[in-house]
């Protein structure tokens, strides 16, 4: 009995003199991106721990390519939280009195770059203690898109797809029919790890509203899908319409090309004709040359007339400037009257008359 009491007393003294100790166990924490992670670090002090209290948090990045980074420090009754730029303004002590034995921190607005091992170090000479916490940041499923891949017609095969825009693996998929019996057809065998349901030989009873829920360890999201299985459409009419439309389009294009070509040919012909006319037409004569030609022709006519025939004509004034009448273009001569045959003249009562012949100088022969 006495030996037992001595053993218990020694154990109590050893525990009392153990000094500084961190009571928080090492652990792993999983949080979603954008949330706040609480990293605990609680400690106790011994009576011999009389030195200044120093608290330091370190981060060992997950890629193991960077050295340990100091993210927050308490020393000399002051807090320093601007050591690590990636966490600046996002890491804080949870307690206002760190000497009470709580060195826990909060990391807000978590990012994927925050993944790593966090180490809490507490020192109060001669006592020293440290603990490690593994932090994992996951992305919740979000931006889920549900759609049908294929033709929703009776007898056809198609697929129902459920695709998240983002989300950390592993992901699990759960399909459910909201209308009617709220059960999937027995022929469908969706896998929890596959985002696709293959539908074979679709029937009208497959129509309805479906929901797809995507989950991982930190959250979930879902989308709705409306499925309408309809009778097959008249494909022959559709194909015929497409062919006719294509032919009409080709005819229209050919007509436009023909009209454009014809218009270009007409414009080219007009330009060539206009150019030929301008080359063939001689330049117009001046008014002075016209007048001179007219005067010369008059002189020739007068010279050929006999003196007896010139009595009715006045003498030409050669010392005067030609009048405006001479400058005018000569008029075309009038045609002589049609000749009548002699027998016709006798029938008409004409009397034959003898006209004496004249020589070139005007004398009667």
From Swiss-Prot:
Residues 286-322 have a biased composition (Polar residues). A lipid is attached at residues 259-260 (S-palmitoyl cysteine). One of its GO terms (cellular component) is intercalated disc. Disulfide bonds join 41-120, 146-223, 162-212. It is a single-pass type I membrane protein. Residues 260-365 are cytoplasmic. The keyword Cytoplasm does not apply. A motif (PDZ-binding) lies at residues 360-365. Keywords: Cell adhesion, Cell junction, Cell membrane, Disulfide bond, Glycoprotein, Immunoglobulin domain, Lipoprotein, Membrane, Palmitate, Phosphoprotein, Receptor, Repeat, Signal, Tight junction, Transmembrane, Transmembrane helix. N-glycosylated. Palmitoylated on Cys-259 and/or Cys-260; required for proper localization to the plasma membrane. Residues 269-282 have a biased composition (Basic and acidic residues). PROSITE patterns: IG_LIKE. Residues 20-136, 141-228 form the Ig-like C2-type domain. Residues 20-238 are extracellular. The keyword Phosphoprotein applies. GO terms for molecular function: beta-catenin binding; cell adhesion molecule binding; connexin binding; PDZ domain binding. The modification Phosphoserine is found at residues 297, 304, 306, 323, 332, 363. It is found in: Cell membrane; Basolateral cell membrane; Cell junction, Tight junction; Cell junction, Adherens junction. Residues 1-19 form the signal peptide. Residues 269-343 are annotated as: Disordered. Component of the epithelial apical junction complex that may function as a homophilic cell adhesion molecule and is essential for tight junction integrity. Also involved in transepithelial migration of leukocytes through adhesive interactions with JAML a transmembrane protein of the plasma membrane of leukocytes. The interaction between both receptors also mediates the activation of gamma-delta T-cells, a subpopulation of T-cells residing in epithelia and involved in tissue homeostasis and repair. The Ig-like C2-type 1 domain mediates homodimerization and interaction with JAML. This is Coxsackievirus and adenovirus receptor homolog. It comes from Bos taurus. The lineage of its organism: Eukaryota, Metazoa, Chordata, Craniata, Vertebrata. The gene is CXADR.
């Amino acid at each position: 009995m006495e030996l037992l009491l001595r053993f218990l007393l020694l154990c109590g003294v050893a525990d009392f003199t153990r000094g500084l100790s961190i009571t928080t166990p090492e652990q792993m924490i999983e949080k979603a991106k954008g949330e706040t992670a609480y990293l605990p670090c609680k400690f106790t002090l011994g009576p011999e721990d009389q030195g200044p209290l120093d608290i330091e948090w370190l981060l060992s990045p997950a890629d193991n390519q960077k050295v340990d980074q100091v993210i927050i420090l308490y020393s000399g009754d002051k807090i320093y939280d601007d050591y690590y730029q990636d966490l600046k303004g996002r890491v804080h002590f949870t307690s206002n009195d760190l000497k009470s034995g709580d060195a826990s921190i909060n990391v807000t607005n978590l990012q994927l770059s925050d993944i790593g091992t966090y180490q809490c170090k507490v020192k109060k000479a001669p006592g020293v203690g440290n603990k490690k916490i593994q932090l994992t940041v996951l992305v919740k499923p979000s931006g889920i898109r549900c759609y049908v891949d294929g033709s929703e017609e009776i007898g056809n095969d198609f697929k129902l797809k459920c695709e998240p825009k983002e989300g950390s693996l592993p992901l699990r998929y759960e399909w459910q029919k909201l209308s009617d019996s709220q059960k999937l057809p027995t022929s469908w065998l969706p896998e929890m790890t596959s985002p696709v349901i293959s539908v074979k030989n679709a029937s009208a009873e497959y129509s309805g509203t479906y929901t797809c829920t995507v989950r991982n360890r930190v959250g979930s999201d879902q989308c709705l899908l409306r499925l309408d299985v309809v009778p097959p459409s008249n494909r022959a009419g559709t194909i015929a319409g497409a062919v006719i439309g294509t032919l009409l389009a080709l005819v229209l294009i050919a007509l436009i090309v023909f009209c454009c070509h014809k218009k270009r040919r007409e414009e080219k012909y007009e330009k060539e004709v206009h150019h030929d006319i301008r080359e063939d037409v001689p330049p117009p004569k001046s008014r002075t040359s016209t007048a001179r030609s007219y005067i010369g022709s008059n002189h020739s006519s007068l010279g050929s007339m006999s003196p007896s025939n010139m009595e009715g004509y006045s003498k030409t004034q050669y010392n005067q400037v030609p009048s405006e009448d001479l400058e005018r273009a000569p008029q075309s001569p009038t045609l002589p009257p049609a000749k009548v045959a002699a027998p016709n003249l006798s029938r008409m009562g004409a009397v034959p008359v003898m006209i004496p012949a004249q020589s070139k100088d005007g004398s009667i022969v």
